[in-house]
């Protein structure tokens, strides 16, 4: 008998450790739009914490915030898309990004910690263990980790590819119970209709999924690839419209919005398994294969 979405409602409600991924588009619109989004996000995460849940936030947006900062400078400086320019923008914008989050989370008495890392950090002998230990300690202290790839030093050859894959890797490292990806659409669409439930990710699904439509590097394709990876590990993934009010809270309470990708296995991913995924998926080595 095939599983149905409703059969996972209890698993979703009882998820103890939740990774939430926010894309660049949610943080690069008009100031009023960004503020409205952050008010909703912070309120929902505060609600999760009050329920006793552990939350890790994976956030893009450093380069987008860097471009905004550059545009505000009283000069004629402009930026393109060269590697050096994107690295410099990330260096400028990451500080702004974390300060923005801190200003909102402090209003609900949540302390945050910035975690920046890259492919080479995880491939080093002690890097994986140190990162896992850092996550564990922060969560035990009740601190909210805010995670991003260290784009100021990452090159195209040694990048995770996008933060959808980064959020999946973080989910494996921290042994999460649920990944929530916030995007700008209502979920995975077929013929302009939301697909509410995917038992598994097929090649047809990937063929219908599009690339980035905003300032980010991912798209629905990378979201489905990441969800497919976590499905093997028994971790469900929800793809939700981050523009909707209290979308995280509504999903957990009702399990009736967005696209839910079901867990299909219970594979335990070892440190070496995660490192192999990184080697296969980083930009300079095979692109999108899993």
Swiss-Prot record:
It is found in: Cytoplasm. GO terms for cellular component: cytosol. Pathway: Amino-acid biosynthesis; L-proline biosynthesis; L-glutamate 5-semialdehyde from L-glutamate: step 1/2. ATP binds at residues 21, 217-223. Pfam families: AA_kinase (PF00696). InterPro entries: AceGlu_kinase-like_sf, Asp/Glu/Uridylate_kinase, G5K_ProB, Glu/AcGlu_kinase, Glu_5kinase, Glu_5kinase/COase_Synthase, Glutamate_5-kinase_CS. Substrate binds at residues 60, 151, 163. One of its GO terms (biological process) is L-proline biosynthetic process. PROSITE patterns: GLUTAMATE_5_KINASE. It is an enzyme of class 2 (transferase). Keywords: Amino-acid biosynthesis, ATP-binding, Cytoplasm, Kinase, Nucleotide-binding, Proline biosynthesis, Transferase. The keyword Nucleotide-binding applies. Transmembrane segments: none annotated. Its EC number is 2.7.2.11. It catalyses: L-glutamate + ATP = L-glutamyl 5-phosphate + ADP. The keyword Cytoplasm applies. One of its GO terms (molecular function) is glutamate 5-kinase activity. Catalyzes the transfer of a phosphate group to glutamate to form L-glutamate 5-phosphate. Belongs to the glutamate 5-kinase family. This is Glutamate 5-kinase. It comes from Leptospira interrogans serogroup Icterohaemorrhagiae serovar Lai (strain 56601). The gene is proB.
């Amino acid at each position: 008998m095939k599983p149905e979405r409703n059969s996972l409602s209890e698993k979703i409600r009882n998820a103890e450790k939740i990774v939430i991924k926010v894309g660049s588009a949610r943080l690069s619109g008009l100031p009023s739009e960004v503020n409205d989004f952050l008010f909703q996000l912070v309120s929902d995460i505060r609600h999760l914490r009050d329920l006793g849940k552990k939350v890790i936030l994976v956030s893009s947006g450093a380069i987008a915030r860097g471009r905004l900062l550059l545009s505000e400078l009283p000069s004629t400086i402009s930026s393109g898309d060269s590697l050096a320019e994107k690295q410099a923008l990330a260096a400028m914008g990451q500080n702004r990004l974390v300060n923005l989050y801190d200003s909102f989370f402090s209003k609900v008495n949540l302390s945050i910690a910035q975690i920046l890392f890259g492919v080479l950090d995880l491939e080093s002998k002690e890097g994986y263990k140190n990162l896992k230990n850092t996550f564990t300690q922060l969560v035990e202290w009740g601190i909210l980790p805010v995670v991003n790839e260290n784009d100021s030093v990452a090159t195209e050859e040694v990048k995770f590819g996008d933060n959808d894959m980064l959020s999946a890797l973080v989910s494996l490292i921290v042994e999460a119970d649920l990944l929530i990806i916030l995007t700008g659409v209502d979920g995975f669409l077929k013929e302009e209709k939301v697909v509410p439930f995917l038992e598994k990710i097929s090649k047809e699904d990937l063929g219908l999924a599009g690339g980035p439509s905003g300032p980010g590097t991912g798209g629905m394709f990378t979201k489905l690839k990441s969800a497919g990876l976590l499905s093997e590990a028994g971790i469900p993934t929800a793809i939700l419209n981050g523009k909707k009010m209290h979308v995280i809270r509504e999903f957990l309470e009702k399990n009736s919005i967005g696209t839910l990708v079901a867990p299909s296995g219970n594979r335990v991913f070892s440190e070496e398994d995660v490192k192999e995924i990184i080697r296969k998926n980083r930009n300079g080595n095979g692109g999108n294969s899993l």
